[in-house]
Amino acid sequence: MGRAKMASQIPPREIPEAPKVGMVSLGCPKALVDSERILTRLRADGYAMSADYAGADVVLVNTCGFLDSAKEESLSAIGEAIAENGRVIVTGCMGNEAEAIRAKFPQVLAVTGAHQYEAVVEAVHEAAPPSMGPYIDLIPQADPGDVKLTPRHYSYLKISEGCNHACAFCIIPSLRGKLASRRIDAVLREAEKLVAAGTKELLVISQDTSAYGVDVRHEERMWKGRPVRTHMTDLARELGQLRTPQGETPWVRLHYVYPYPHVDAVIPLMAEGLVTPYLDIPFQHASPNVLRAMKRPANEAKVLERIKAWREICPDLAIRSSFVVGFPGETQADFEYLLEWLEEAQLDRVGGFRFEPVAGAAANDLPDQVPEEIKEERYARLMEKTEAISAARLSAKVGRHIKVIVDEVGEPDEDGDIGATARSQADAPEIDGAVYLRNVPASLKPGDFAEVLVEDADAHDLYGVIADRQG
């Protein structure tokens, strides 16, 4: 009987290299969350992430299909991925137009619609099968952790899919379906996990945050041994109880909030410091005539009263909104009404859009389409008005101390001065302004909170110094 072969003589078994996936994520923060979920699932299945086209075995393009300009950007991204890599899977909102995509790019491997996670993962498995081995498959996998496409210190928290509104300019319900709320205990578990992992700012997103739980009749779920309703107010209150590992209260920022009556109950939570004093409310217009044509709530006068009441309860409240000019039927009087309303509302942050047709939207067939040159003129005046309001509101902060969260820290200049880019509670990442800091300590890092003395302001941004380093 021969001797057993020594372990050192057994040739090592070659472990197959994990296939790599590249990702291009376009569109809104909700699409970014979809991309994170897809990549998290793929990493759990043994895939690695590629930072460029060349190193990827397959490239995912998560598209946006809301506006024609967004579709053009999506098609351009698909074309670039095909040219640079050749093995491309398309998903996201524009995936609903599979025929159009395949007509332009017949070589795409697969096309799936918005938030069709299983279909995307299956397509990736077909295009680049995960590494399999007789030994690897028997080893329990550790939790790979969630893939994040945002900086470590802030995270988007998606609480629902879809929308029950039927706005004339929008096709979201046809792309993402009716409102479907996530279980509140699942949302809170995700938030708790994110904060424990280093998130300092939670950005609550959906198509209609105020409607959270309507589809499930605000059902109760147990959380920390007590019942909690699937409702925006309960969610905001519970998120306000979270603490970072350092004992800090993370910022909780509410986006896409329709001004339903129960929004009033959130304002005291902001005054108490449990929720960031910031509301992103998509007003879209102020003229009752235009709002009715848009199939939006037309109670702009009541909204002005509520904004005033909100600011009395929480003076630091910042309100962001977006407005569309040139909607079919918008008269000069309607537009002037909007400008007057904005002057009275004194919103802190405003995004403006020229109306553009969206395939499948009811507004395309409305009479009295506004000529492009008038749209441009109104858009320019809208931006001029809102920039003047913003400049005045920001200049009022000069000389005040405010709290900021740091996004980036620069390298020392020739004099050794280190600059940093931060945001105040009035600034959501990527869409609002910034607070630019001078002479920050070398120990400052992204995600840190700091007290800042505001020294200067312009129409969009603030400039300052850490409070204990002034002079």
UniProtKB/Swiss-Prot annotation:
GO terms for biological process: tRNA modification. GO terms for cellular component: cytosol. Binds 2 [4Fe-4S] clusters. One cluster is coordinated with 3 cysteines and an exchangeable S-adenosyl-L-methionine. Gene3D superfamilies: Methylthiotransferase, N-terminal domain, Nucleic acid-binding proteins, tm_1862 like domain. Residues 149-392 form the Radical SAM core domain. The keyword Transport does not apply. It is an enzyme of class 2 (transferase). [4Fe-4S] cluster 2 binds at residues 163, 167, 170. Its cofactor is [4Fe-4S] cluster. It catalyses: L-aspartate(89)-[ribosomal protein uS12]-hydrogen + (sulfur carrier)-SH + AH2 + 2 S-adenosyl-L-methionine = 3-methylsulfanyl-L-aspartate(89)-[ribosomal protein uS12]-hydrogen + (sulfur carrier)-H + 5'-deoxyadenosine + L-methionine + A + S-adenosyl-L-homocysteine + 2 H(+). Residues 19-129 form the MTTase N-terminal domain. Keywords: 4Fe-4S, Cytoplasm, Iron, Iron-sulfur, Metal-binding, S-adenosyl-L-methionine, Transferase. PROSITE patterns: MTTASE_N, MTTASE_RADICAL, RADICAL_SAM, TRAM. It comes from the Bacteria. GO terms for molecular function: 4 iron, 4 sulfur cluster binding; aspartic acid methylthiotransferase activity; metal ion binding; protein methylthiotransferase activity. It is found in: Cytoplasm. [4Fe-4S] cluster 1 binds at residues 28, 64, 93. The keyword Transferase applies. Residues 395-468 form the TRAM domain. Its EC number is 2.8.4.4. Catalyzes the methylthiolation of an aspartic acid residue of ribosomal protein uS12. Belongs to the methylthiotransferase family. RimO subfamily. This is Ribosomal protein uS12 methylthiotransferase RimO. It comes from Novosphingobium aromaticivorans (strain ATCC 700278 / DSM 12444 / CCUG 56034 / CIP 105152 / NBRC 16084 / F199).
